[in-house]
């Protein structure tokens, strides 16, 4: 699942905002983070996993959404992003909160930072066709925006340290970092575009 998403070009919405269902992602061959999460949810439902997504709220309003699942070994995720550190995690986290916290360091850039998270079962949408609709599925986005999120509190001093490190790295490189992040052994494989640098 993660390999398939990694192979898709990221949907930068060059021709206007989209929120495509799995059918739309397959038809267009591209996906942004929420489209990838919805696609993963549809596919993994066929393997008897509930369609759960984890929504991050960021201090700069650039939120992120990933598909999450629980295996015998713990909680893991499947994700697509423009940032190398915000892709999938292996199923080794004891709780959804621990999984969410694993994204803390790699979420920090010039302005970003996690402030809250929520796990949402998309079956609450009832008969709304978020899986295979041929049109945009904006109701999913509205659901996530309105859903109560649990706060994640981190040391402001630590946040500023990480932000300074990120800014210093980007001043020297035209690409985004990932090799200096802790816990990379718990990440799933990155898309090829990131592997040779960072």
Descriptions of predicted regions:
Residues 1-198:
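A structural boundary/capping signal
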